[in-house]
Amino acid sequence: MKAFSPVRSVRKNSLSDHSLGISRSKTPVDDPMSLLYNMNDCYSKLKELVPSIPQNKKVTKMEILQHVIDYILDLQIALDSHPTIVSLHHQRPGQNQASRTPLTTLNTDISILSLQASEFPSELMSNDSKVLCG
């Protein structure tokens, strides 16, 4: 049931929103399929942007999210190990810095990436990184 206002609209001579092609945006409750398509587009974009996700292989949404988390944490480690950032960390005493807890290996691709990561110079694999997820 819709509520009606006892006051007449001031816009009686104007064109209706419908005739102008203007519509109110629907909430996700009004249009769940639109939300689903939008989320699928976001997952597709994430799959394109993260280099460790195989492009020619079907991966689940959970795998995409885990790859994204790993990628962000790896970028954080690389950033934290940069000499300028390292010197800033030493200037802030009392900061609690814990080592990163790795996520569960999803598939062979992740295992291969882990083996490749062990070949990086030790300054990139510092244990002084900040934990992003508690």
UniProtKB/Swiss-Prot annotation:
Localization per Swiss-Prot or TrEMBL: Cytoplasm; Nucleus
Q: What induces it, per record?
A: Expressed in a circadian manner in the liver with peak levels seen at CT12 (at protein level). Expressed in a circadian manner in the suprachiasmatic nucleus (SCN) of the brain and heart with peak levels seen between CT16 and CT20 in the SCN and between CT8 and CT12 in the heart.
Q: What does the record say about the knockout?
A: Mice exhibit disrupted locomotor rhythms, reduced locomotor activity, enhanced phase shifts and an increased rate of entrainment when subjected to a large delay of the photoschedule. Show a reduction in lipid storage in the liver and white adipose tissue.
Q: Does the record bear Cytoplasm in its keywords?
A: yes
Q: Where is this motif: Nuclear export signal?
A: 106-115
Question: What does the subunit comment say?
Answer: Interacts with GATA4 and NKX2-5. Interacts with NR0B2. Interacts with CLOCK and BMAL1. Interacts with IFI204. Interacts with NEDD9/HEF1. Interacts with ASB4; this interaction promotes ID2 proteasomal degradation.
User: What modifications follow translation?
Assistant: Polyubiquitinated; which is favored by Ifi204 and leads to proteasomal degradation. Ubiquitinated in a ASB4-depedent manner, leading to proteasomal degradation.
Q: Does the keyword Transcription regulation apply?
A: yes
Q: Would you tell me the protein name for this molecule?
A: DNA-binding protein inhibitor ID-2
